Amino acid sequence: MVIDFHVHAFNPKVAEKAVEKLQVCSGITPFTRGTAEETIQRFDEWGIDKGVLLSVATKPTQQRVINDWCAEQDGGRFISFGGIHPDAEDYEQEIAHIKELGLHGIKLHPDYQGFMIDDERMDKIYDAIERADLPVIFHSGYDCVSPDLIHSTPERALNMIKKHPKLKVILAHLGANMMWEPVSYTHLRAHETELHLV
């Protein structure tokens, strides 16, 4: 079975706009218009059996809509993660909702959500995710949305992991997109944690 562990698709109401913004920012031509249906068509073309669907709440008000949509996509070809926003006052309730929906983890994107991965204000959120026994996947390394400020460097990720050694952490982009040199060192130092690089 082939599973793509990092898939982005969007609610049809926002898919076209989201993909356009990402294309302008990254300079990368997308393979779909960002819908779940087109993504599944590409899975078929490329021999992919399932994909881990990762959606980002870029505003606190988006959490519930995104999580309910991700739950609708879950099963079949998608293994859906939910999303919370660090500025949402109701993050604990939303984590409980994610768990109730049967979603498989939580996606956080430090660049799009405006936090450093090792920021102390995130500790209570990481503790709540750990209590819910859910894995959390982070964008890590470079992102075109904030090219001059990397919100999740390998060193910062390691700082966070040391404070939360029981948190099930997945660092996307092999631990640091376009920052390959420090990744192996960080990974070796974090060997006693629940750290996974995808």
How should these model regions be labeled?
Residues 1-56, 61:
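An N-terminally biased module of ancient metal coordination in phosphate/nucleic-acid-related enzymes
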Residues 2-5, 54, 81, 107, ...:
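Active-site neighborhood of phospho(di)ester-bond hydrolases with catalytic His/Asp-centered motifs
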Residues 15, 148-155, 179-185:
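Histidine/acidic-residue-rich catalytic or RNA/ligand-binding cores of hydrolases
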Residues 49-50, 60-152:
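Active-site gating/metal-coordination segments in enzymes
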Residues 143-145, 175-179:
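Short, catalytically relevant binding-site loops at active-site mouths
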Residues 186-193:
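Conserved small/polar residues in nucleotide/adenosyl-binding loops
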